[in-house]
């Protein structure tokens, strides 16, 4: 549905005059195991897609337009694939890279930031993204607890994962992680 803000193009004319590197970019094509659950996390399609997308990583995060620009928040989608595959180590490594590229409220720029350069953002770039903050907050929630598997309409067929991704730095002796009344498909969860 056109917004009225600008003219829309569809079909072949949309790529007319564009260099190929600007088309066919990785975006949400990695959402194969989570949240869609189309494939098992260890399925060849999932693992091959993750491996392919990582080839264009820069500074530890995803890029856009085949490596031309950094893209901070979309990295959360890959982190969730690693999370459900049980690869906590890679999920944490990518998470730390993600938050290194975020502001104090987890906001991030969508793109148009060149890798390994200064942080001067192209003035045509959308302002810091609240969506980045939302995705980061939800990712942290999923590190504490997340639901997965089975039939989403039948809780008894689903699994609840408590603290599936925890950094060793978060579990020092004498300290503890806690959740109080965290909402889930299984009701409110309290854990320490």
What do the predicted segments below correspond to?
Residues 1, 28-42, 77-88, 139-150:
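Well-ordered alpha-helical scaffold segments within catalytic/enzyme domains
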Residues 23-27, 69-77, 86, 128-135:
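Aromatic- and histidine-enriched alpha-helix N-cap/loop-to-helix transition segments
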Residues 1, 46, 70, 84, ...:
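Extended aliphatic helical segments
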Residues 17-21, 64-68, 78-80, 126-127, ...:
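Generic recognition of flexible, low-complexity loop/linker segments
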Residues 89-192:
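Non-catalytic C-terminal accessory modules of carbohydrate-active enzymes
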Residues 1-73, 93-117:
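Extended glycan-interaction surfaces of carbohydrate-active proteins
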